[in-house]
Amino acid sequence: MTPSEFRQSVRHGAFRGPTAGHCGPYAQANLAILPEAVAHDFLRFCQANPKACPLLGVGEPGAFRVDALGEDLDIRTDVPSYNVYRDGRLTERVESLEALWRDDFVVFAIGCSFSFEDMLAREGIGLRHVEEGRNVPMYRTSIPNRRAGIFGGQLVVSMRPMRGADAIRAVQITSRFPGVHGAPIHLGDPRELGIADLNAPEFGDAVTIRDGELPVFWACGVTPQTALMDAKLPIAIAHTPGHMLMTDITNASLAVF
């Protein structure tokens, strides 16, 4: 299935689940959508936190298409599920933004680690959340983001359990792709990130960690949602964690070496 066909299936309600494992050669994007009045501060926030918030594209005010991301793409309908935040609280999840869209909304598309999972799988590195049919586990850490204007919050990480040799290879592979979070930020003891229980992720689903495996943590594009909550905007919108926008950008084009 091409990215365009995948977006059509989402647009027409045929697909509503997590997007990991779909359209493997193509990049997926996290979303943050917020009023133009605070868009400059949010752009500075992304620039100050590039590991967690690598930008793939930014829309014009009111535009629900971002040409850099793909053709026949509609931000309002082409994501399986959206989170709506009001005054810093998650108030609803919706399957379309058509009724909520405003002329002052600015779209930020942020790289997603699902994008490099195809390369990991090609190298024979297992992805437990895909194997178990679950959403990838994501955790809010105790690490503060670098603040920009009203935006702060804490770093969020995704976790994939791996054997040591696979973890080393994963570092080598993902280092080539800083536009989708790049190399892991931590391997091993989750307490060093302020994570108390790997079986209780704040976002996504817990997965099995087998004997001899260690947790490998990547900076995650859900991080901006902690910043949106921290800012307590009257309204802000994001993808539901694990439910991404499929783009026409090839993963190969994002490699830096």
Curated annotation (Swiss-Prot):
It comes from the Bacteria. It is an enzyme of class 4 (lyase). InterPro entries: D-Glu_cyclase, Putative_hydro-lyase, UPF0317. GO terms for molecular function: lyase activity. Signal peptide: none annotated. Transmembrane segments: none annotated. Its EC number is 4.2.1.-. Keywords: Lyase. Belongs to the D-glutamate cyclase family. This is Putative hydro-lyase Bcep18194_B2576. It comes from Burkholderia lata (strain ATCC 17760 / DSM 23089 / LMG 22485 / NCIMB 9086 / R18194 / 383). The lineage of its organism: Bacteria, Pseudomonadati, Pseudomonadota, Betaproteobacteria, Burkholderiales.
